[in-house]
From Swiss-Prot:
This is Alanine--tRNA ligase. Its cofactor is Zn(2+). Belongs to the class-II aminoacyl-tRNA synthetase family. NCBIfam families: alaS (TIGR00344). Its EC number is 6.1.1.7. Zn(2+) binds at H573, H577, C676, H680. The gene is alaS. One of its GO terms (biological process) is alanyl-tRNA aminoacylation. Keywords: Aminoacyl-tRNA synthetase, ATP-binding, Cytoplasm, Ligase, Metal-binding, Nucleotide-binding, Protein biosynthesis, RNA-binding, tRNA-binding, Zinc. One of its GO terms (molecular function) is ATP binding. Pfam families: DHHA1, tRNA-synt_2c, tRNA_SAD.
Length: 888
């Protein structure tokens, strides 16, 4: 039975039983602490947690969810039952049926005949486990279903009691196993041998609430839930393995075709030895996982989801090369896995080119890294072995990472294959030093000096009290003063200084928002604050110019925010949140924030996305953003726990470290909810119009949108309007007629360029006729050698040489031409006909000789070579040398 048929039978079974079929969610959800969806129930969490009412008429649902688990990537292929990507088929009940219903549904599908729509498994080969104290489930299996008591085994909390690992719903579970036969292991049921007895379905009975605790079995059960729910998960791949009669999940109809292609590309044979078998399985598994991640919008990167994808793709490439592959392989692997997966995921067809583009680009970059890095690793490994040691030092691992881009995981794998360990502590220490240097360099740029220990006293004992959320003016005591990076007790007019205050209303740069501008006042003393930076997370450093007067440590001053600056900065920051929300509406949840910068009237927003945005997409994003502005929504600030913020659906930067208490900015209810410590407007209409300037690439898989807000947006739009009107006036048309007018002019220009090109081509053909007629003969080979000063570019020169070659195609002939462009450089081309090449007269050899006389370098293939020279005056001498070589 093919995998797609197993999927259909599962869905049909539960739809007939009144469940609503729910499409698989993306592998990428908004949860900042969840790399990928890793269980079938994840998209249903809000219903299980009681945060939302389930929208299913009968209170039941079924889905086949895409899942990725990457905790044990190194184990892929070693165990033959686990994949990094898998399809979890599940049925869910929200306060409807419970244990008996879940058990009955599962048994009917598994043991029902194929003719009746079931999977046709032999009931005599099915075993079940239940939680140690779950007499109810054991009795249902035995009395209602008829499973003999000897095939019902009881296990403790670690195996048969489910929770999410945090306080919330939990409950006992019952697992269904299939006995694959004595050839796979010992008798005795799942307790005795979980290789012979393969788990295929887990039924979770959510009936209790879990309290605090750690691990799978060290937590308190607080009490019963108001409603009893069902969450089940059947592994599609494992059932396919059984129904298709293959030894493991890598040999099913979905993955075996990739192994077949790997055999063709490498010359190795699957099944001959354990090491190669693991590599074949890695290729098959990772090709599918990588393809599905790219499908859902992940791009290779150096952290988070992008790092996982990069690691998977690089393991494929390296495994293929260890098996004997030469050159590029990913395109064929990806095409094969897309063919097998498209019947279940038709959206692959529309994304095929994008998936290939991402994979091929990553492979191209890594192949360069692999060659140079592998050579260094092998040298270091040999040195270690020859010294009698077994540990590759941290410095070598760091160099592989820092210079050659080798992820430490790859170095660890290669070391293990070579029988070596890696000094991971030494590696981590060097990485920490590098990060510290980078931070110090960045801080030095911000503060004008690199020694940050000077702030230690204030960081430890006097963290700044920030008052700027509530007020723009604060009276405060001066705790410290710095001038030229040194502590001082007083400052005077004209100095550039840093001021440490007890409390401040000025915002310190963070979260992409620039530091406030403002003043520090005391009597006649005026300090102009040019920037505010943070040291650590709690100390505000005010960079200021003493405009008049002076200050001493201990003085009480008034710190004042420039209200115009703050207002415009708030407009930009809240505008960034709206653009982020609009982006996700248009592009989907994979368009996650990669960085931002907000300053008065201007914002830029970086996000993970592989392709440039179309004008239509940009227009839609701008329209959604401005509709949100026009809606005059309240902008609410909520201070709450991190757990509660996540429960609200607040977006966060993946991998960012947040405290237990966080600040949530909510605009328009569910439209935009983000964790943010910045300053914001109180109503969305205060942002004013948002004008998107455009979008661009700022790195592999990262795009950037730039926009103006508020008054700057008005100014930009007015400037654009004036520009359009000026252009329309100069063309003597109305502004709305400009597109047609420009299109007409563009077409005229294209026509003129074509006419010029045609004329140029005719001139070249005429010139070719004359050059062929003037050919001389050297050692039985015709030679056309000419300086053509009226041919300025390499394209025309190559065309002329190709034309001459074609006219002399039936005889041995060599063509050598040199031109001269407007800058004085001399492009040159050397060509040879097939007959000449066959006789040993090669264009690339003559190009090198000629280049020596005209101060140039040339290279290429035997039939056509080219180069660029600085001085064509030596052409005649060069041709004489070519003649001599031809006559030799």
């Amino acid at each position: 039975m093919q995998t797609h048929e197993i999927r259909e039978r599962f869905t049909n079974h539960f739809v007939k039983a009144g469940h609503e079929a729910v499409p698989s969610a993306s592998l990428i959800l908004d949860d900042p602490n969840l790399l990928f969806v890793n269980a079938g129930m994840v998209p249903f969490k809000p219903y299980f947690l009681g945060q939302q009412n389930p929208p299913f008429p009968n209170g039941t649902a079924t889905s086949i969810q895409k899942c990725v688990r990457t905790l044990d990537i190194e184990e892929v292929g070693i165990t033959t039952r686990h994949n990094t990507f898998f399809q979890m088929a599940g049925n869910f009940s929200f306060g409807q049926y419970f244990k008996e219903g879940a058990i009955t549904h599962a048994w009917q599908l598994l043991t029902g005949t194929v003719a009746e729509g079931g999977l046709g498994l032999d009931p005599e080969r099915l075993w079940v486990t239940v939680y140690l104290d779950d007499d109810e489930a054991a009795e249902i299996w035995n009395k209602k279903i008829g499973v003999p008591s000897e095939r019902i085994q009881r296990l403790g909390m670690a195996d048969n009691y489910w929770s999410m690992g945090i306080p919330g719903p939990c409950g006992p579970c019952s697992e269904i196993y299939y006995d694959r036969g004595p050839e796979y292991g010992a008798e005795g049921g799942p307790i005795a041998d979980d290789n012979r007895y393969m788990e295929i379905w887990n039924l979770v009975f959510m009936e209790n609430e879990r309290g605090e605790g750690i691990g799978k079995d060290n937590f308190e059960i607080v009490g019963p839930l108001p409603k009893k729910n069902i969450d089940t998960g059947m592994g599609i791949e494992r059932v396919a393995c059984i129904l298709q009669g293959v030894d493991n999940v890598y040999e099913t109809d979905l993955l075996r075709p990739v192994i077949n292609v790997a055999e063709e590309l490498t010359g190795a044979t699957y099944g001959t030895n354990d090491d190669d078998n693991i590599r074949f399985r890695v290729i098959a598994d990772h090709s599918r996982t990588g393809m599905m991640l790219i499908l859902d919008g992940v791009t290779p990167g150096n952290e988070g989801r992008g790092y996982i994808l990069r690691r998977l793709l690089r393991r494929i490439i390296r495994s293929a090369h260890l098996l004997g592959a030469k050159g590029k392989t990913l395109e064929k692997f990806m095409n094969t896995i897309m063919d097998t997966m498209t019947p279940s995921y038709p959206e692959i067809a529309d994304n095929r080119e994008r998936i290939l583009r991402v994979a091929i680009t990553e492979e191209k970059a890594f192949l360069k890294t692999l060659a140079s890095g592998t050579e260094l690793f092998e040298d270091k490994a040999d040195q270690v072995k020859n010294s009698g040691n077994k540990v590759l030092d941290g410095a070598a691992a760091f160099k592989l990472h820092d210079t050659y881009g080798f992820p430490i995981d790859l170095t660890l794998e290669m070391a293990a294959e070579a029988g070596l360990n890696v000094d991971i502590e030494g590696f981590n220490s060097l990485m920490a030093e590098q990060r510290a240097r980078a931070k110090a360099d960045n801080r030095a740029k911000k503060h004008g000096h690199a020694d940050l220990s000077i702030y230690r006293e204030w960081v430890d004992e006097h963290p700044t009290v920030f008052t700027g959320y509530d007020e723009l003016t604060t009276d405060s005591k001066v705790l410290g003063l710095l001038s030229a990076g040194n502590k001082v007790n007083e400052i005077k007019a004209g100095e550039e200084v840093e001021v440490i205050l007890e409390a401040s209303p000025l915002y310190a740069e963070a979260g992409g928002q620039l530091g406030d501008r403002g003043q520090i006042l005391m009597g006649d003393t005026v300090l102009k604050v040019n920037d505010v930076q943070k040291i650590g997370k709690k100390l505000w450093v005010h960079k200021a110019t003493v405009a008049q007067g002076g200050l001493s440590v201990g003085d009480v001053v008034t710190a004042q925010v420039d209200s115009d600056w703050r207002h415009a900065a708030r407009q930009a920051h809240t505008g960034t949140h709206l653009i982020h929300a609009a982006l996700r509406q248009v592009l989907g949840p994979t368009a996650v924030q990669a960085g931002s910068m907000n300053k008065p009237g201007y914002l830029r927003f970086d996000f993970n996305y592989t392709e440039s945005l179309t004008p239509r997409q940009l227009e839609e994003i701008q329209n959604i953003t401005n509709q949100a502005v026009d809606s005059d929504w309240d902008v609410n600030t909520i201070e709450t726990s991190l757990e509660e913020a996540k429960a609200m659906g607040a977006l966060a930067l993946f991998g960012e470290n947040y405290g237990s208490e966080v600040r949530v900015i909510e605009v328009g209810g569910p439209f935009s909810i983000e964790l943010c410590g910045g300053t914001h407007v109180t109503h969305s209409s205060q942002i004013g119009p948002v004008a998107i300037l455009g979008e661009s690439s700022v790195g592999s898989g990262v795009r950037r949108i730039e926009a103006y807000t508020g008054l700057d947006s008005f100014k930009y739009l007015a400037k654009e309007q004036a520009l359009v009107e000026n252009i329309a006036s100069s063309m003597k048309v109305k502004p709305e007629e400009l597109p047609d007018r420009i299109a007409a002019l563009t077409q005229k220009l294209k026509d003129a360029e074509k006419a010029i090109a045609d004329m140029r081509s005719a001139q070249l053909m005429a010139q070719a006729t004359g050059l062929v007629a003037g050919a001389i003969e050297v050692n039985g080979v015709k030679l056309v050698a000419q300086r053509v000063s009226d041919v300025e570019n390499m394209g025309d020169l190559r065309s002329l040489a190709a034309d001459i070659k074609q006219r002399l195609d039936d005889v041995p002939a060599v063509v050598a031409l040199v031109g001269e462009d407007a800058s004085g450089k001399a492009p040159f081309v050397v060509g040879a006909t097939k007959a000449a090449v066959s006789a040993g007269y090669k264009a690339n050899a003559y190009a090198k000789i000629l280049g020596q006389y005209i101060e140039g370098n040339g290279g290429g293939k035997p039939d056509m070579a080219q180069g660029s020279a600085r001085n064509s005056s030596g052409f005649d001498q060069g041709i004489a040398a070519v003649k001599a070589e031809m006559s030799a």
